[in-house]
Amino acid sequence: MGIITIVGLGPGDPGDLSRAAWEALTSAPEVWVRTARHPTLSGLPASVKLQSFDDVYETTPDFAQVYGSISERVLELGARPEGVVFAVPGHPLVAERSVQLIRVGAAERGLTLRVIAGLSFIEPTLTALGVDALPGLQIVDGIDVGALHHPNFHADLPALVAQVYSAEIASQVKLTLMNQYPDEHPVQLIHGAGTADVRVESLALYEIDRSPHIAHLTSLYVTPLPRRSSFEALQEIIAHLRAPEGCPWDRKQTHLTLRRHLLEEAHETLHALDLEDVDKMREEFGDLLLQIVLHAQVAIDEGEFTMQDVIAELNAKLIRRHPHVFGDVVAENAEAVVTTWEAVKAAEREAQRATDGQSAADPQAEGLLDSVPPGLPALAQAELYQKRAAKVGFDWPDISGPRAKVSEEIAEIEAEADPDSRGREMGDLLFSVVNWARWLKVDPETALRESNLRFARRFRQVELAAATAGRDLHAMTLAELDALWDEAKRVERGA
């Protein structure tokens, strides 16, 4: 068998061809090129016989299959005694999908592969921009980025997005980037890097798909965000705080000592959500995230697990529990999604039992309510207990059942004279109210929190009104306080 020689044509200027590339191209009886639309080819001697795969682009409707078809034909040509010389734009191992496929295929078929390097699009792009790659330049493919919903690189470092060769790709890339960058974020389009017609276009992110200059040699340079905002930067700060030269308080923390702070931050986050205060949400989400990353760093320091372990397990769980998104399961509404979710969780529990050598009938196996966190607020815990029990049919047949149970529990409280018994009956009443709320599709925890907020807000208005009138709350009658309360309610409803 012959040899497959892959030659890098460079970015476009014939003068950028390496000596080895020139000799390989000019000495071959024929040269196959991925595309004849490359400026370097015009600088080759007329004696070089060129064959292109442009017909594959024209006859293959699915662009994803183009490189597969080209690589297969190159492998067939390479199997001939004379082999084949295959030339590609730029460097053969930079953003060249066909070469990746050829490398795999050649190894499987026992073919010899020779790669002759070429100048990639990266070097002339950096020259046109006047920037250095060493501060952490990230290089990604525009087709891949456009297919995502969030960028696959972080925003503290610059990124070069290759192959933004059409307005459609630019639009897809723009929408993905806008999940991380502001619409007005400054970026640069680089057209024809490495050619005499190179052009650098500075514009805002939202404008990139409007450029009239986008063509097959267009790339996008994304500048870093002005503030440190990547997850990696946060991990570095927390790791520094926990380091020997870091903060004494952070260094002494353990999973157990941080429990109170995690709970406090969770409740402060809930308060921000109750207020629907966007600025407060942003701050409290950060404080809550701090607790998660700090716990992960404690685990790293103790050799327990890493943040990557946490994220990898979460990613796998999200994909596994959403087969209607990432698999072939159909879920046409939210109810079907919940059914699918519960089926997957049940399968996970069964798999865990098998791993532990247990069966569902094993008295030591995990019960239906065992996974409900014991530290949940009482209302939320009661609701979860009831939902779990309802899944196996332990529930009222209709809403009249829980409504009647509330009345029954009130009567039992009124019939009890013993304080301890009244306490138990009051608990049963609250549990029944939670069950009624569940049937009404009301979140009892949220409903009570909102009632608490309303009470506190209205009572503060009562205090202010009394102070404005020069009255002491302690000296006012209940009727006077009720009047101020009613006025506070009226003002609130009007607002």
How does the language model describe each region?
Residues S202-K280, D328-E416, A466-A495:
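Extended low-complexity intrinsically disordered regions
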Residues S69-R73, P124, E265-E268:
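Well-ordered alpha-helical segments embedded in enzymatic catalytic cores
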Residues M1-I116:
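Class I S-adenosyl-L-methionine
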Residues L262-L270, V278-I300, E304, Q308-A316, ...:
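An amphipathic alpha-helical micro-motif enriched in hydrophobic residues
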Residues G2-V7, E23, E30-V33, A79, ...:
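Beta-strand/loop-alpha-helix module characteristic of Rossmann-like adenine-cofactor folds
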